[in-house]
């Protein structure tokens, strides 16, 4: 039996995915294929490249601190061209691409098709209003409602899946403009099944239902999160088992809560371990 792991988007909360993976590995639950959206694509890529959970956590912390820095060149290019920041994003997203590319290079990898473990990461083509999926498998959609790309630098693919609207600029690749995959598919359960998984374990985050936005930017982020949460619900229902990580002390961009999210991901997954072993016991 092949086990697939689907990881939802959720910003800094994605550290919880790493804690969950640690708990799974410690209990002998071996994953055969993986898929993730937005921050889930970052964790999926690191996992598929065979980084340990300790290495993943260290890299995650490094990414979080570096990625959220304003790039002066990008900032002033927007100012000089009078470009609308909310239309393009406060950050370029180049640091995400560079960081993943460096991690891939250390493993002798470059392109998504270089990864041995089956992997997928959804994104959104903003001009076409269409779902795209980056994968190292030969996948097609006969309905043409979804497009698949299996030849793209890994860093570029992750950046495209994680280009959170209004925060990161769209990722441009071969004439396409890609933004966060959560708009169409924030928890890629169905896509992980297409990788060959017999059963899929999904990990998502509870929504901040009572969070009170304090400014226009927070209102925009909350609105996007509500959209993503709605997209996640149907995918949870199609999972063989789903873990919901409740992280009330964290929000999407609070980098001070990385360890908290990681620890809660680990603890929560251990609490579900008896059920997980029962469902995924045949390997």
Each language-model region and where it sits:
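Patatin-like phospholipase
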Residues: 1-37, 45-283
């Amino acid at each position: 039996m092949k086990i697939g792991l689907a990881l939802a988007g959720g910003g800094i909360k994605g550290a919880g995915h790493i804690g969950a993976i640690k708990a799974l590995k410690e209990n002998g639950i071996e994953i055969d294929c993986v898929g993730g959206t937005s921050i889930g694509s970052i964790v999926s890529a690191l996992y598929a490249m065979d980084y340990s959970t300790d290495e993943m956590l260290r890299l995650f912390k490094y990414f979080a601190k570096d990625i959220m820095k304003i790039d002066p060149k990008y900032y002033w290019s927007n100012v000089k061209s009078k470009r609308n920041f909310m239309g393009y994003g406060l950050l370029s997203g180049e640091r995400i691409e560079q960081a993943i590319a460096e991690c891939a290079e250390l493993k002798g990898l470059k392109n998504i098709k270089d990864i041995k473990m089956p992997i997928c990461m959804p994104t959104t083509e903003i001009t076409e209003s269409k779902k795209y999926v980056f994968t190292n498998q030969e996948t097609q959609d006969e309905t043409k409602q979804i497009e698949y790309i299996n030849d793209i630098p890994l860093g570029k693919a992750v950046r495209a899946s994680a280009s959170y609207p209004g925060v990161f600029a769209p990722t441009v690749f071969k004439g396409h403009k890609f933004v966060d995959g959560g708009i169409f598919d924030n928890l890629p359960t169905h896509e992980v099944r297409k990788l060959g998984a017999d059963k899929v374990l999904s990990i998502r985050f509870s929504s901040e239902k009572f969070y009170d936005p304090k400014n226009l930017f927070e209102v925009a982020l909350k609105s996007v999160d509500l959209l993503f949460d709605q997209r996640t619900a149907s995918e949870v229902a199609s999972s063989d088992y789903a873990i919901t990580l409740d992280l009330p002390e964290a929000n999407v961009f609070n980098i001070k809560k990385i360890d908290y999210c990681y620890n809660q991901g680990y603890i929560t997954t251990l609490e579900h371990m008896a059920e997980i072993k029962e469902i995924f016991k045949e390997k």
